[in-house]
C-alpha cells in the first residue's frame, strides 16, 4: 500500500535528483555583513466597515486616536468616550534590505493587536518604523491587502484564511540608509548556508581555480576568506564573478526529520537502512458517547425529563506481523521497504526510532 508519505518522499527524490550537480555559489553562501534589518512600529488602521476595535475594551486604541487628533490640531474633550468601530490598533513590521537608499520602497506587514474582527478595506495611517537602535528608518502608509474573507448573519459566520493581518506592497518609503560594510582592505568573508567541510572546501577551490591560488581559504566548515581587489570600486564586479561560480555540493549527511506534532516524516536521498525485522501492532481507542433521554411514563406528574449520557470505551489492538526489511541504499528502495510494513506516517515515528536504536537506520534522527 502506497501511503501519502511515500508519494511525498518520492517527489522529494525527484526534485533532488540533481543535488550532486554544481550550483551557483550565491545559492550556497551569503556575504558576511550583507543582511537585512528588522523594523517595527505601532500605528492605526482606519476605514474599517464596523469591524474595528471595541474602544471600551482596548483603551490604547482610543488613547492613540486622541493623541493623533491632537497632533492634527483637533482637541478631544477630556473624559469623552468615543464610540468608534472603524479604527484598529496595529503593529507594523518590515525588513530593510541591505544597500537600501532613501526614497526606495519596501513591503510592510500589518497585524491587529486589539479585538478587531477584520482589517479588510482599511488604510494604514502614517507610521514610523524603528530599528533596534530606536532610530526611524522608514515611514509606512497605504491601503491594506487582506487575503482572507468572511461573512456573518443570524448568529452564523464563515471565515476563509486570516482577516486580522494584511500586507502593503511597497507601502513604506526608506528615510534613512544603514551603512553596509562587507569588505575591509579587500578582504571578504563568505558564510555557507549549511555547515559542511566538503562543500566549503569545494567553494574555496573553485574561487582559487578562477582567480588564482591563495585567493580563497576555508577557515572552517562554514566560513571562507576571500582576497579581493583593494580598490572599492572594483569590488562589486569581483563579487559578481565570485557569486556566479559553479560549486559542486558535497553529499549531504543522511538525516531523517520527524515532526512529532504533525506526524510528518522527511528524509534525504543519502538515508540507508540495514536488514532488519520489524513488528508493530496498532493500538486503537474507540470512544462512543450517546445521550439517552428518559421521560415520565404518565403525563401531568411531578416527574422530569432527564438526559443521561451513555459512554462506551473500546480498546482494540491488532496483532502486528513480523516484516523483513532488506538492506537499501537508494531512497526509492527505502520507501518501498517502509511501505512493506503497511504503516501510516504516525506509525513510522515509532518504527524509525526503534530502527535507529537497533542500528538498522543509517541516518541522523532529528525530532522537531
Curated annotation (Swiss-Prot):
Major localization class: periplasm
Cleavable signal peptide? 1-22
Q: Name one GO molecular function term.
A: structural molecule activity
GO BP, sorted A to Z: bacterial-type flagellum-dependent cell motility
One Pfam family, short name: FlgI
Q: Which GO terms describe its cellular component?
A: bacterial-type flagellum basal body, distal rod, P ring; outer membrane-bounded periplasmic space
Q: Which UniProt keywords are present, listed alphabetically? A: Bacterial flagellum, Periplasm, Signal
Task: Name where it's found.
Answer: Periplasm; Bacterial flagellum basal body
Functional note? Assembles around the rod to form the L-ring and probably protects the motor/basal body from shearing forces during rotation.
PANTHER family the record matches: FLAGELLAR P-RING PERIPLASMIC PROTEIN FLGI, FLAGELLAR P-RING PROTEIN
Complexes and interactors:
The basal body constitutes a major portion of the flagellar organelle and consists of four rings (L,P,S, and M) mounted on a central rod.
Annotated family: Belongs to the FlgI family.
Q: What is this protein called?
A: Flagellar P-ring protein
Amino acid at each position: 500500500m502506497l501511503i501519502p508519505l511515500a508519494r511525498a518522499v518520492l517527489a522529494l527524490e525527484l526534485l533532488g535528483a540533481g543535488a550532486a550537480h554544481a550550483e551557483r555559489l550565491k545559492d550556497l553562501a551569503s556575504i558576511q555583513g550583507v543582511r537585512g534589518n528588522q523594523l517595527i512600529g505601532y500605528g492605526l488602521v482606519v476605514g474599517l466597515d464596523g469591524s474595528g476595535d471595541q474602544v471600551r475594551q482596548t483603551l490604547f486604541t482610543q488613547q492613540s486616536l486622541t493623541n493623533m487628533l491632537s497632533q492634527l490640531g483637533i482637541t478631544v474633550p477630556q473624559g469623552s468616550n468615543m464610540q468608534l468601530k472603524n479604527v484598529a490598533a496595529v503593529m507594523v513590521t518590515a525588513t530593510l534590505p541591505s544597500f537600501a537608499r532613501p526614497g526606495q520602497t519596501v513591503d510592510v506587514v500589518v497585524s491587529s493587536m486589539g479585538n478587531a474582527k477584520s482589517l479588510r478595506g482599511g488604510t494604514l495611517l502614517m507610521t514610523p518604523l524603528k530599528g533596534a537602535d530606536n532610530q526611524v528608518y522608514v515611514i509606512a502608509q497605504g491601503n491594506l491587502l487582506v487575503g482572507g474573507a468572511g461573512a456573518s448573519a443570524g448568529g452564523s459566520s464563515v471565515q476563509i484564511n486570516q482577516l486580522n493581518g494584511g500586507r502593503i506592497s511597497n507601502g513604506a518609503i526608506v528615510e534613512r540608509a544603514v551603512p553596509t560594510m562587507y569588505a575591509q582592505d579587500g578582504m571578504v568573508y563568505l558564510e555557507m548556508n549549511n555547515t559542511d567541510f566538503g562543500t566549503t572546501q569545494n567553494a574555496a577551490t573553485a574561487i582559487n581555480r578562477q582567480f588564482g591560488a591563495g585567493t580563497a581559504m576555508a577557515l572552517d566548515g562554514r566560513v571562507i576568506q576571500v582576497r579581493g581587489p583593494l580598490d572599492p570600486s572594483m569590488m562589486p564586479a569581483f563579487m559578481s564573478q565570485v557569486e556566479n561560480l559553479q560549486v559542486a555540493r558535497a553529499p549531504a549527511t543522511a538525516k531523517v526529520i520527524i515532526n512529532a506534532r504533525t506526524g510528518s516524516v522527511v528524509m534525504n536521498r543519502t538515508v540507508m537502512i540495514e536488514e532488519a525485522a520489524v513488528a508493530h501492532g496498532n493500538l486503537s481507542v474507540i470512544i462512543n458517547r450517546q445521550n439517552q433521554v428518559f421521560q415520565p411514563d404518565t403525563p401531568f406528574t411531578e416527574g422530569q425529563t432527564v438526559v443521561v449520557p451513555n459512554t462506551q470505551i473500546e480498546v482494540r489492538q491488532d496483532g502486528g506481523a513480523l516484516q523483513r526489511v532488506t538492506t537499501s541504499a537508494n531512497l526509492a528502495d527505502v520507501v518501498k521497504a517502509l511501505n512493506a510494513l503497511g504503516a501510516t506516517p504516525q506509525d513510522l515515528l515509532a518504527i524509525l526510532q526503534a530502527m535507529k536504536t537497533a542500528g538498522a537506520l543509517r541516518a541522523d534522527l532529528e525530532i522537531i
